[in-house]
């Protein structure tokens, strides 16, 4: 009866072999090495009835052995019922756990056994840990109880035990330690259990076969053990159900957390992508900025080089402009110097021409005087009755007149040719000097000629001004003074006074100085009334007329009246003013005293106005040598009023021992 109950219980509860056979198709890892799923299923089918009986026999023999030898196994003296109950419960739990995978909870167990699972399965692992420990203890006691059972007689049971053990070991969850120490200890316990199981397997294989022949009584305390087993089974089912409920709750919580974590992960990934994109944008922007900076740097360098080149060009241009300005200045200076040279050359050329013309005029003037003298004599001789002596004198004077005219023409031709050569560019010093013509002595005059030309004291004309007051043309200082000095043409003419140029007011009037052209040669002269006047001398009357008043006395009276009217002027200033008035009017004839006084007053007022306007620096005079303005610092001090440069008078001052002025004999 007990055997039947055990068999019924064994048939009602799934055995480890059946559970392993059901789960063999799900996982191939729980099978032993060298067995395929088909082979294990076939063996389990063939060996299932004997396995139950062999298990029951083994249990009964183990129980009897423990009862008979309590001292030999003190560790297994807890009781056969407890050992058998634990073994059956462990096998049922293993089978139930293996069968859960076939009922659709394989994913849940995989999640529980996965060591890299979520953090929320800690409570499930803690609740399953004592169950797995109890399963390990039951399996260990079962191996110790069936140690005398040979592997040859119970091959299916050993295979199922090993499969259930392997499946139980594979299903053990890895509990992460709270502090890193407990996990290490649990792993060490698991390693020790697995090593003890392996050792027990090896010992079970190497056990003597004679122990399998022992007999065990299985009828003792069966019902009590079955009741306990059923109670434990119910409790385990309830605990298992609680564990499943907790697992579902934890799974739901884990799903929520997983969704939150996934959402957070997505957000983090999105943020990460955005950050990566921002980093990429910043990197691109940095590269672009770097390229832009390099480009700008190159542009700046190029611009700097261009600016340097432009600066060099500008500097070169500035230097060139300075050189051009200096060149222009030098050109202007050279042009000015050339102009000055041309002006000086032209001035010297004009001075040379003026010198030649002055000398020509002087020589021609002397020859014209001789010509007029000859004409005068011929005119008188023609008016006299012809006699042998007068004819001879007339011939001599005609010969002299022709010679003088020829000589005058030659002098003019020579001087004109020299003037033309000088105008063409020849130097005066390089031209041959024109000799001064020498007149032959005049023919001797007869006694009647001497009587005719003997002037009467009562008829001696007086000049309105003294001869010394008449100024001759000024000779340029550059001319040779020696070339301007002429010898006296005729000794007879030298005794007579030189004719002065007629005054502007005397044009058309009778010349009062014709009687002074010829000086008397004899002390006796006939009366002028007995000599008829020559026909060409109209205006000279030999009648006895009252003599004119002397012009000098009249000029003195005019000066005295003017000095009385203008006491601020002296005699020299008044004479100068009268000369200016005469130069401006070309004549003083026909002026009344009142008109003359008005002209003098106007001239004095003009002088005062000019003096007041040019009061600042004194007017510079012209140098008589170079005809340039003489500055006060360059003026050579002299006793006279002549102005000369120090450099111009330097050679004269060194060579002249008397240190006199070259234009006047006044000493310093």
Swiss-Prot record:
GO terms for molecular function: zinc ion binding. Keywords: Acetylation, Coiled coil, Metal-binding, Phosphoprotein, Zinc, Zinc-finger. Residues 60-71 have a biased composition (Basic and acidic residues). InterPro entries: TTC3/DZIP3-like_helical (IPR056872), TTC3/DZIP3/RBM44-like_helical (IPR056870), Znf_RING (IPR001841), Znf_RING/FYVE/PHD (IPR013083). Gene3D superfamilies: Zinc/RING finger domain, C3HC4 (zinc finger). Residues 220-379 form a coiled coil. A zinc finger (RING-type) spans 623-665. Residues 43-59 have a biased composition (Polar residues). Pfam families: TTC3, TTC3_9th. CDD domains: RING-H2_RNF214. Residues 1-87, 103-125, 486-552 are annotated as: Disordered. The modification Phosphoserine is found at residues 15, 40, 48, 54, 196, 497, 511, 516. The modification N-acetylalanine is found at residue 2. Residues 523-536 have a biased composition (Pro residues). This is RING finger protein 214. It comes from Mus musculus.
